[in-house]
Amino acid sequence: MSVIGFGKTAEGALITAAMLSTRITSATVYYNGQSITFGSGHGFDTQPFDDCVCAINAGTILGPLATLINQIYESATDDPSVSTALSGADFTSMKTTSDSQMRRGTIQCEDTKRYLFLRTEAQGTTITIDFGAVWIGGKPRQQPVEQHLEFDV
């Protein structure tokens, strides 16, 4: 995608999975789709980007009620166990049957630490929900699109 205007071309984006589409069936905590029990890593590296979007797709509940707590965490290293929550970057919702939703939030990566994690926590007694999320990173790469020429006539 390119945007032309003001004598510059701005382009550049990357889309990567924050959590692959999965069916959550128990009360658990994930960091970018990985259970913290099974190791660290898989953080979204913000170094190449100026800003990013985290888009969350919570599908239909196949049970009575569940609470999904999604929050963005930041860390200087690719280790979610030492990450801290970003203030105001949370998506908490009560879900009922046939109530699917799509949520998104924009984050200025220049103001955060290097790695971002989507922390997803499912709470409830009978949980079955289809869930997925993506990170979309963007950085304008600016290039001149015009040159001023002068002619001696």
Where are these regions (language model features)?
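C-terminal interaction-tip segments
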Residues: 1-19, 123-153
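Solvent-exposed, flexible loop/coil segments flanking beta-strands in beta-rich domains
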Residues: 1-47
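Short amphipathic, basic-aromatic surface patches that mediate peripheral association
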Residues: 39-44, 55-62
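Noncatalytic modules at the cell exterior or secretory-pathway interfaces
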Residues: 50-53, 110-127
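Extended, low-complexity, turn-rich repeat/linker tracts enriched in Gly/Pro/Ser/Thr and Asp/Glu
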Residues: 59-67, 78-79, 123-128
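Beta-strand signatures of extracellular beta-sandwich domains
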Residues: 69-73
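Solvent-exposed serine/threonine-rich low-complexity stretches and specific carbohydrate-binding patches
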Residues: 85-96
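Exposed aromatic-hydrophobic patches
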Residues: 100-109
